[in-house]
Amino acid sequence: MSQNNNDIYILGIESSCDDTSCSIIKNGILLSNVTANQSIHEQYGGVIPELASRDHQKNIVPVVDAALKKAHVTLSQINAIAVTRGPGLSGSLLVGLSFAKSLALALNIPLMEVNHMQGHILAHFIDEEGFDKPTFPFLALKIGRA
């Protein structure tokens, strides 16, 4: 994968509920998206917050590593880290935020905290060929399950 000095690589981390996800974006193009699902909750009929945060702790390093490998990108190429800051399960968010903040500090790169709901809405403007930037302001309706 060729790189020039103007390339911008962003590592994104999502851990607001029971999925641990990491994506790598280069200049607005999605290079990789890796998710670890937590099947442990199926037996309870819903997400158990404490179990979710424990699984995030177990999954976050392998998920980030897999996303970097799939994108053929090294940590030294990453220019910034984006991470979900909420809303979500507090323990799950804490795992993602702590990991992202520690990594950003270690790499001496910016950390961008992302609102989970805004992320759902704006994710529709990302595709594998780049961004179609929305014209702001705009109105959106987000319907979720409880």
What are these regions (language model features)?
Residues 8-11, 79-80, 110-112, 137-141:
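Structural motif
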Residues 83-107, 126-127:
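Short Gly/Thr/Asp-enriched flexible loops that form oxyanion-binding sites at enzyme active sites
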Residues 1-3, 105-106:
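Short glycine- and acidic-rich boundary segments immediately preceding or forming the N-terminal edge
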Residues 146:
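Conserved small/polar residues in nucleotide/adenosyl-binding loops
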Residues 52-59, 91, 95, 110-113:
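Catalytic cores of large soluble enzymes that bind and process phosphate-bearing ligands
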Residues 2-6, 114-138:
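Conserved phosphate-binding catalytic cores of ATP/NTP-utilizing and phosphoryl-transfer enzymes
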Residues 71-77, 99-116, 123-125:
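Nucleotide and nucleotide-moiety/phosphate-recognizing core
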Residues 6-87, 120:
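N-terminal beta-alpha supersecondary unit
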